[in-house]
Amino acid sequence: NDNVRWIPAWASNRIGSMVEERPDWCISRQRFWGVPIPVFKCKSCGEIVANEESFDAVIELFRTKGADAWYTTAPEDYLPSSVCCPNCGSHELEGEKDVLDVWWESGVSHTSVLGTRPYLHRPADLYLEGSDQHRGWFQSSLLTSVGAYGDAPYKAVLSCGFTVDENGRKMSKSIGNVIDPIEVCDEFGADVLRLWVGSVDYSQDMSVSRNIFERTSDAYRRIRNTFRYLLSNLNDFANADFVSADEMLEFDKWALSRLQALVAETTQAFDEYRFHNAYRAWYDFIVSISSEYFDAVKDRLYADAADSVERRSAQSVLADMLEAMVRQLAPILAFTCDEVWEKFPEGMMEEGRVAAVALAGWPDEEDFAPQLPASEREELLTSYEVVMEARDAVMKAIEEARNDGLFTKSQEAAATIMGNTELIEALGAHGLDTLAEIFIVSNVELEESDDADGFVASVSQAPGEKCPRCWNYRELGPDGLCERCHEVVAAFDMQADE
């Protein structure tokens, strides 16, 4: 038992106590169907005849004629002459009429299945069944394997609870609370059903209802929209466009560091069969990265020059996110991820690319471009904690200003952030332009105040005029555009003239 990994961990004590307290196992049953017990009785004295020679003869009989031959073929027709009663020496034998307990049949699958197929191996990597099988298949397999070979037939055993309705009641046709998975697939789609399965803690009974599937459908929609955001913003991106670590912007490095930390966390969760933890980590990441990063880099993605380092830097991160997300969520959202895999930007489809995401392999650190040293990733994640704290203060101030009717878009705002010297210095180290991008405002000012408890933010109307192209408030040139947009549009005009 100590050499087997039991999932959940408490199952180890459960199976241990059950085996310790169980009575002797009577493996014979009196039925007209089942697997025969391959032993013989002496017709003269009733002694049991069972030895290596008789077993080999029965094995060969079953191999050539099937198990029914036990009832249709006389023992003397297939037993060697050397097989006789060890008590009286008689050769007049009859086959046992009792059959094996069905738990013995399934319990020896480690030999009848794993031991006879060259593409399988024993012990099995995993046995998987409901929690009731601690008394059934898990236990019968353990007993027969230890008895025959001295060890367990499995490396790990995973047991799951049962589905109940939203009130915790067992599903029953008489109650009318049974939910047909086919109907769920027809109404919500197969991946919503799969997402529900992947999102629940299977170690205990799992509640299921229409309301739960509706909430799961909402979560699925958010994931699907994230895929759409990534695909649409990578339409013109190719693998040759990945920027180097030296070129990548700091804010993008932070997002990439978060992604790599997530992949490490979820990989461990999948390895430990904690699928609901892997899903929860991905979902929480999607929710937070959407507001903290996706919204912030839209300005670069939509308004910067198409092939600028700044835009390619953000796209490099989005490409890494797409690759990691589609590969890691494929075991749960099989159909959606295959659809995404087929819609990958043409420039990201390398020659020899596998046809299905299931064949693409699991993402690891080598799959990310650029490669960031672990020490740099940790430093970025730590240093950006203060940035996100300041962001929360700015977002709160913007929301209050919106409620007061001062403005509707955050780009209309200039943010002033106050904090003590240490906080302001740490925040200012990231650069005012970077902070303005993260906070999605047109201007940022920092002020030291020893009286401030944490960060205190206020917003006011940003100076300048609204650029009609990027919507940021800047000093506009003769063409009515900000300096950045003027340069981008001028480049377009030059290309058109050529």
Q: What annotation goes with each model-predicted range?
A:
Residues 5, 12, 25-29, 41-64, ...:
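A broadly conserved sequence feature marking short terminus-proximal activation segments
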Residues 114, 189, 490-496:
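Short metal-binding segments enriched for Cys and/or His
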Residues 85, 478-488:
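Cysteine-rich micro-motifs
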Residues 213-239, 331-349, 416-450:
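Structured, non-catalytic alpha/beta "coupling" segments that mediate domain-domain communication
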Residues 83, 93, 237-264, 295-397, ...:
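Acidic, turn-prone loop/beta-hairpin segments
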Residues 465-477:
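Short Cys/His-rich zinc-binding micro-motifs
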Residues 1-236, 255-298, 316-329, 466-469:
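Structured secondary-structure scaffolds
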Residues 52-54, 95-98, 477-481, 492-495:
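Short Cys/His-rich "knuckle" micro-motifs
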